[in-house]
Amino acid sequence: MGTSHPAFLVLGCLLTGLSLILCQLSLPSILPNENEKVVQLNSSFSLRCFGESEVSWQYPMSEEESSDVEIRNEENNSGLFVTVLEVSSASAAHTGLYTCYYNHTQTEENELEGRHIYIYVPDPDVAFVPLGMTDYLVIVEDDDSAIIPCRTTDPETPVTLHNSEGVVPASYDSRQGFNGTFTVGPYICEATVKGKKFQTIPFNVYALKATSELDLEMEALKTVYKSGETIVVTCAVFNNEVVDLQWTYPGEVKGKGITMLEEIKVPSIKLVYTLTVPEATVKDSGDYECAARQATREVKEMKKVTISVHEKGFIEIKPTFSQLEAVNLHEVKHFVVEVRAYPPPRISWLKNNLTLIENLTEITTDVEKIQEIRYRSKLKLIRAKEEDSGHYTIVAQNEDAVKSYTFELLTQVPSSILDLVDDHHGSTGGQTVRCTAEGTPLPDIEWMICKDIKKCNNETSWTILANNVSNIITEIHSRDRSTVEGRVTFAKVEETIAVRCLAKNLLGAENRELKLVAPTLRSELTVAAAVLVLLVIVIISLIVLVVIWKQKPRYEIRWRVIESISPDGHEYIYVDPMQLPYDSRWEFPRDGLVLGRVLGSGAFGKVVEGTAYGLSRSQPVMKVAVKMLKPTARSSEKQALMSELKIMTHLGPHLNIVNLLGACTKSGPIYIITEYCFYGDLVNYLHKNRDSFLSHHPEKPKKELDIFGLNPADESTRSYVILSFENNGDYMDMKQADTTQYVPMLERKEVSKYSDIQRSLYDRPASYKKKSMLDSEVKNLLSDDNSEGLTLLDLLSFTYQVARGMEFLASKNCVHRDLAARNVLLAQGKIVKICDFGLARDIMHDSNYVSKGSTFLPVKWMAPESIFDNLYTTLSDVWSYGILLWEIFSLGGTPYPGMMVDSTFYNKIKSGYRMAKPDHATSEVYEIMVKCWNSEPEKRPSFYHLSEIVENLLPGQYKKSYEKIHLDFLKSDHPAVARMRVDSDNAYIGVTYKNEEDKLKDWEGGLDEQRLSADSGYIIPLPDIDPVPEEEDLGKRNRHSSQTSEESAIETGSSSSTFIKREDETIEDIDMMDDIGIDSSDLVEDSFL
């Protein structure tokens, strides 16, 4: 029966052609022809397969386990192919599905199509078919059913499925196992054979994410490489873990590639497959393909990328324009160049072989990356100009290649005429007109002529000048590619004619005209033109001189006096000095004054040493200082000097100010006669005595002090009459005039009767405590005894006297505005006197003064409110007093050493910067400075309190000695005091006294009242110190104005007759000075106002 089936099959196949076709499509046949068969343990069995082509078997065991399985082919007369499978000794391992199939139908992707039979081999000791270890891992897709393959060797054996929770209900098929939907975890199959229980090892169910479609992405970091570089390609699968991926690439056969897998689970599942090909060569060029297949389903996806490998880098330049380009003037145009290059190139532009300097608004370049190896560079002309013409070159270069492309750019410019001139041919009367024009393209030149000058405004009067006209020659030639010159020559011009040059090109035209004048008229025009030019030059010169004259700084008195203040405190009325009365008692006869050498000279005036005869009864001959203006002084400066005189008469006398002695205001230049101060200004005195001070204070070593700006070693060779240093100009240059300019001064012999000078020795250390001192020691502070040199107590004495002098000015509502050591003089007896020395100081060349508009300001001495808000008060003078203290205790140093007056200086002052303690100041003195430098003016001490503070630092007897000297001064017949009295009726400033003693007592009592009212605290906005104002008339700066009538030149001396009248007295006075050991030459060299 087993052999009849093939015979019938063959016979059926031969019946008709249709049957034959069906036969080709039919499956092979298996004998026995059953779906399943049970075979006894250890018995043998055989299976035969018949087919029309070659057939093969597929069975449960692997080739390693199939030693007792034999397969052979048999011949068959019917033409069929027969394959026999024989098992000699059946065991439980032989249980499974046996399949016969055609060889040509075997593929890797699909299941075999053939005939099947399932064989059972029951074994009482083996309930379940043996499995490989991988079979115990059950992979389940999301929520899909799965099979746990616990197959039995006997189809009749009952089986149950268990997990950690117990029996799991599921359908069971002895050929497959349990089929169902299982959660993740271990499962065990349990069977009972003849009362004996069998269990499998655990089946582990594992769930993998899988989708019905594959999301595959392929990426290559680069698609172009050079030999030797590493190719890297990646493929990524998203949201699927059951994937099989295969690479296909040129180097696959050689196994050159290295593959890696990376699983990324955050934020979603991603499998990244990386292919790396090191040391790439040209042969590695080609398609790189990755194919992904889902392991549990028939889902496939494929991606590919083309990689090219070059032997070395390359550059290709493809411009989108020609080598000659034109652009219209003011046109916007872009020039684009395409570049292919690897490695990435550096792209630059050149103009005329020079690196192109981009103008932010007119020409720019940029580079844009289009693709991996494609770039686009643009040259942008925003508004083309004529100078943009030239040769432009783009250069692209990398490590392996350099390529460039050059094109010429022409900016097309409308025609313009550069020049139109006529050349004369002398007496022959011939004239040539030259017309130079430029433009791109090169313009054509056309000549036109108008013979009737009066009608040349009408275009019809102009005719084109032909080339071949008798006595007229035209020619044209080009200078370069954009400039052309045309000429027309007239053999003779007998009358005035007009000639027009017309230059034109494609972009525009321009014309220009000139007149040709006959030679007879030309000479007349030349003379008229010369006169006109000369007149213009004269007018311009006058304007320049007027401007220079107006910009020249003018002399202005610094002192100001308040007349009244508004109730709200915001408006101030100042005393107009010109409105003050001038008491004729101050007038001094000119013939009683003999002028000597110049002590100080400035931009506006000078101070001259003089001898006055008859100023006081006790001193018929007195050495004085005379202020005067220069002969070139303007009326406003004469008015300012007169204002200064009236203010001095208004203030009255004080020991610590330079007192007025008299004045000459009539029949000549204005002279102001003041006290003569023997030792000169305080700065010079401190410099001169610095070595003696340092010798008395060994803890203050002699070192080079930067604040002085000089070398102490050179002091022996320096003249102290010069107040400015040549190197830095810190102090005024007191230029000495020629000694023959004035009659030499005759000195007096007697000492001052109002300065009671006692000499005694004293010496105090730099750091000291207040102690009681002998009267003689105290008096030494107010004496001319220099045997002990300059001491610290001398510095404190100077400090105290300046405070008393400023206290007096404050009591008179007078603001100084220029308090500094250069404006403090030292008289005999070491008496300090405050003055305003601006007239005789060359402030325009003095570094201490900074130009602000038409004035100069001592910025380093000024308070912040004066610098920034133009506010001047007694409290701003307190700030300057603190700077003066710094000068004194640094022995004449310049404030803020090493700092220039600039924006940095102003910012530091605003931010609260203050100078450090000078080397020779005690902590108590420095504390005074700091109080004076408070940024809030109202928190600064008054001069009254400053006097008391400094007084406490001096010996106890000092004040008594000082007050005695001051009182003696007020009782004396000193001219400054005497002229305040009226001899006829013993009245003093409008108050009548019965006798001299009552007057003096009232004066002494008034001193304390005067001190208590010293701190006025007024805030005085003075408009003439605005940092940047234009120069204004003096009358605009005050509430009232007046004009002085004193305008005259300075006389250079007094009459000889006057000198002869005083000769006897003068000789006697000189003898007296010799007796006290005063050298008259020293007085001239070391003294000034």
Swiss-Prot record:
Extent of Polar residues compositional bias: 1041-1059
Repeat recorded as keyword: yes
Cross-referenced PROSITE patterns: IG_LIKE, PROTEIN_KINASE_ATP, PROTEIN_KINASE_DOM, PROTEIN_KINASE_TYR, RECEPTOR_TYR_KIN_III
Annotated Acidic residues bias: 1065-1089
Gene3D superfamilies in the cross-refs: Immunoglobulins, Phosphorylase Kinase, domain 1, Transferase(Phosphotransferase) domain 1
Span list, region Disordered: 1018-1089
One GO cellular component, as annotated: platelet-derived growth factor receptor-ligand complex
InterPro entries reported for this sequence: Ig-like_dom (IPR007110), Ig-like_dom_sf (IPR036179), Ig-like_fold (IPR013783), Ig_I-set (IPR013098), Ig_sub (IPR003599), Ig_sub2 (IPR003598), Kinase-like_dom_sf (IPR011009), PDGFRA (IPR027290)
Keyword Repeat part of the UniProt annotation: yes
Effect annotated for changing residue 742 to F: No effect on autophosphorylation and phosphorylation of PLCG1. Abolishes activation of phosphatidylinositol 3-kinase
Signal peptide: 1-23
Chain positions of site Breakpoint for interstitial deletion to form the FIP1L1-PDGFRA fusion protein: 578-579
Subcellular location: Cell membrane; Cell projection, Cilium; Golgi apparatus
Domain Ig-like C2-type: 24-113, 117-201, 202-306, 319-410, 414-517
Membrane topology, from the record: Single-pass type I membrane protein
A GO molecular function held by the record: protein kinase activity
Domain Protein kinase: from-to ranges: 593-954
Residue ranges of the TM segments: 529-549
Gene Ontology biological process terms from the UniProt entry: adrenal gland development; cardiac myofibril assembly; cell activation; cell chemotaxis; cell migration; cell surface receptor protein tyrosine kinase signaling pathway; cellular response to amino acid stimulus; cellular response to reactive oxygen species
Annotated keywords: ATP-binding, Cell membrane, Cell projection, Chemotaxis, Developmental protein, Disease variant, Disulfide bond, Glycoprotein, Golgi apparatus, Host-virus interaction, Immunoglobulin domain, Kinase, Membrane, Nucleotide-binding, Phosphoprotein, Proto-oncogene, Receptor, Repeat, Signal, Transferase, Transmembrane, Transmembrane helix, Tyrosine-protein kinase, Ubl conjugation
Result after altering residue 659 to K: In GIST sample; constitutively activated kinase
Description of how activity is regulated: Present in an inactive conformation in the absence of bound ligand. Binding of PDGFA and/or PDGFB leads to dimerization and activation by autophosphorylation on tyrosine residues. Inhibited by imatinib, nilotinib and sorafenib.
PTM field: N-glycosylated. Ubiquitinated, leading to its internalization and degradation.
Annotated consequence of substituting residue 561 to D: In a GIST sample; constitutively activated kinase
Function: Tyrosine-protein kinase that acts as a cell-surface receptor for PDGFA, PDGFB and PDGFC and plays an essential role in the regulation of embryonic development, cell proliferation, survival and chemotaxis. Depending on the context, promotes or inhibits cell proliferation and cell migration. Plays an important role in the differentiation of bone marrow-derived mesenchymal stem cells. Required for normal skeleton development and cephalic closure during embryonic development.
Protein name: Platelet-derived growth factor receptor alpha
Organism: Homo sapiens (Human)
